[in-house]
Design a protein with these regions (language model features):
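Nucleic-acid nuclease catalytic cores
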Residues: 78, 95, 102-210
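Metal-dependent nuclease catalytic cores that hydrolyze phosphodiester bonds in DNA/RNA
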Residues: 1-113
């Protein structure tokens, strides 16, 4: 299931998303003014869409047909730099991709939630979940987001079948100059924070319609 537009639904019922849960509890929050946030959001969305098309078709920004990338280049010329950064990350980190922008429904105890993982695959032969990020400053919620995504992935696919039989969680922080940082997340507290955020978000929705 690819990332849906307009929210996640199961049997006609809207399901709370991972990012909605983190936003409702202010684990995930935005800094800066509304105008800068909107610009960041548009560029980030274009980068995700462009990288997904390229990854799914085994192309790079420079080898893809022009008609594929022109819509994203039109959003901002910065998109090219971010895509080059992801291409460099994949090559240098020996990343093999199995799933691209793949959505899951998952139950955490009795609470249903939905999420979309950016990439699932291998990094240097070991199982990896990788989030692509374009903000220039590291944001605190990234580890919690990845923890929720790991829960959803394992609930749907089961544990990885290659050593060490668990996922390593990474953020590929991409920069417009074509460089990147690959940031590991290992804090077990991230899982507890996600559980609490999801429960509070669902309670708020049921109690107040929020």
């Amino acid at each position: 299931m690819a990332r849906p537009e307009g929210g996640y639904y199961q049997d006609g019922i809207r399901v709370v998303s991972l990012t909605e849960a983190l936003s409702a509890t202010r684990v995930r929050r935005w800094s800066g003014n509304e105008r800068s946030w909107d610009r960041r959001r548009k560029i980030g969305s274009a980068v995700h869409q462009a990288c997904a098309i390229l990854d799914c078709n085994g192309k790079t920004w420079d080898t893809a047909p022009r008609e594929w990338i022109e819509p994203y280049d039109a959003v901002s010329h910065e998109v090219r730099g971010f895509c080059h950064a992801w291409e460099r990350c994949k090559e240098e980190q020996e990343i093999i991709i199995h799933l691209v922008e793949h959505s899951f429904f998952a139950k955490l105890e009795i609470t249903l939630f939905a999420t979309t993982i950016d990439r699932e695959g291998l990094r240097r032969g070991e199982p990896a979940l990788i989030e692509l990020k374009t903000p220039q400053l590291k944001e605190a919620y990234w580890g919690v987001q990845l923890a929720g995504q790991e829960m959803a992935t394992v609930a749907n696919l089961g544990p990885p079948r290659v050593r060490p039989f668990k996922y390593h969680r990474w953020v590929a922080q991409l920069f417009v100059n074509g460089t990147y940082k690959l940031i590991p997340y290992v804090d077990p507290m991230d899982f507890a924070i996600f559980r609490q955020s999801l429960n509070i978000a669902v309670w708020n929705r049921n109690a107040y319609g929020e």
